[in-house]
Design a protein with these regions (language model features):
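Acidic, turn-prone loop/beta-hairpin segments
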Residues: 1-31, 60-150, 154
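Aromatic-lined ligand-binding clefts that engage carbohydrates, nucleic acids, or primary amines
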Residues: 43-47
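Short helix-adjacent coil turns
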Residues: 34-41
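Hydrophobic residues within the alpha-helices of tandem HEAT/HEAT-like
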Residues: 50-51
Length: 154
């Protein structure tokens, strides 16, 4: 059921706050790159976020939360966080990969009904929320990722 209210920020686990912090940092960076007419840098930043952080870390570390039984607040938070990331990424990449972004966006909103627009190109471009950016948390997680990568490389 996609009508559940969003889980409060303070009740979200640290891993959700981390990926949403990175997402807000990404929105800020991509907006700056596009304003500076640097679409290649914007595209690379989006790709790095999706591949390195969303897919390789967030989704992998949260498999149990996604597949656990029952719809707990923790599971709802995980689903809402992932949905927010995917919807925002679709909007961010719309100027760079218009057809793919539109298909991703339409597939998401067809299920949830959260946006009443016919295309990602008719939706508002994301605006970052500075209060959701936690550079300390981002740095701590980056350190954990670096250590994990070093151990795996041995």
């Amino acid at each position: 059921d996609y009508s559940d209210p969003d889980v409060e920020w303070s009740k979200r686990p640290e891993i959700d706050r981390w990926i949403l912090s990175l997402l807000n940092s990404l929105v800020k960076d991509v907006d700056g790159y596009l304003e500076a007419y640097e679409p290649t840098r914007a595209g690379r930043a989006i790709s790095d976020f999706v591949n390195d952080n969303l897919s390789n870390w967030y989704v992998r570390l949260n498999r149990r939360r996604f597949w656990g039984g029952g719809m707990t607040e923790d599971k709802l938070s995980a689903y809402q966080t992932l949905y927010t990331c995917l919807e925002t990424v679709a909007k961010l990449m719309a100027p760079i990969a218009p057809f793919y972004a539109d298909q991703l966006f339409l597939d998401l909103v067809a299920v949830t009904g959260r946006e009443n627009v016919e295309s990602v190109h008719l939706s508002d471009f994301p605006v970052y929320d500075e209060s959701k950016i936690d550079k300390n948390l981002e740095e701590r997680m980056q350190m954990a990722q670096d250590v994990s990568s070093m151990v795996a490389a041995r």
